């Protein structure tokens, strides 16, 4: 009985400390998500891990999540995560798939090959992210901004023949995220001042999860 009480007390203390740490985080401020909602939702928790990893990259930067971008037909397309630093804007498309992943830059669909030779198709994430980038540029009204596309898959999958010809497009697994962005930063030209970074952040912030209306979020079509 005494041991059970100690275990329960330990769990509560651990939860309290983690929640206090979370409540002070930039992720909480940017997302508006509650701690319990994050740790019980796989998609939100994955996004939380992405955010924390990107926070570790040295240098001035801004990070936004769930940017709802207006389209000409009145619908929206959602950029999962946007990282802004002195070398440009990095747009992340997250895919939580397992199995073997096959595809190429131009195909409309990619294939997920699971156990027992079961195959599932899904929308080409490079084309999805190209769509996000198109509408991000429209918000900025600046063509000179360097915008890079990164498709991030779960560590549970195996990427097969997915190299992109465009040097501004990367297809990686989650464990390579920070390493990849650091490498892209190191090999890119500085194009944005701190003032530019903040200005771009403020423009995109108006379309994020914390500022988009509930109607916009409810009407967003997930693909």
Model-derived regions, located:
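Surface-exposed interaction regions that form or flank ligand-binding interfaces
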Residues: 1-77, 84-88, 100, 117-223
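A short, glycine/acidic-enriched catalytic loop
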Residues: 111
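Active-site ExK catalytic segment of metal-dependent nucleases
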Residues: 91-100, 106
């Amino acid at each position: 009985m005494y041991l059970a009480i100690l275990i329960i007390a330990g769990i509560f203390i651990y939860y309290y400390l983690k929640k206090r740490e979370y409540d002070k985080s930039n992720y909480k401020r940017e997302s508006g998500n509650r701690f319990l909602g994050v740790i019980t939702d796989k998609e939100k928790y994955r996004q939380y891990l992405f955010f924390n990893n990107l926070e570790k990259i040295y240098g001035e930067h801004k990070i936004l999540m769930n940017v709802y971008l207006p389209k000409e037909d009145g619908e929206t397309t959602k950029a999962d995560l946007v990282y802004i630093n002195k070398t440009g804007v990095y747009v992340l498309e997250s895919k939580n798939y397992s199995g073997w992943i096959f595809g190429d830059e131009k195909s409309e669909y990619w294939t997920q090959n699971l156990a027992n030779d079961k195959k599932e198709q899904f929308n080409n994430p490079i084309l999805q992210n190209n769509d996000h980038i198109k509408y991000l540029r429209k918000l900025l009204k600046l063509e000179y901004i360097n915008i890079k596309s990164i498709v991030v898959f779960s560590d549970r999958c195996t990427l097969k023949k997915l190299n992109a010809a465009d040097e501004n497009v990367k297809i990686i697994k989650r464990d390579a995220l920070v390493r990849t962005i650091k490498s892209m930063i190191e090999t890119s030209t500085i194009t944005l001042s701190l003032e530019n970074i903040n200005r771009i952040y403020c423009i995109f912030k108006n379309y994020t999860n914390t500022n988009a209306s509930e109607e916009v979020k409810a009407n967003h079509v997930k693909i």
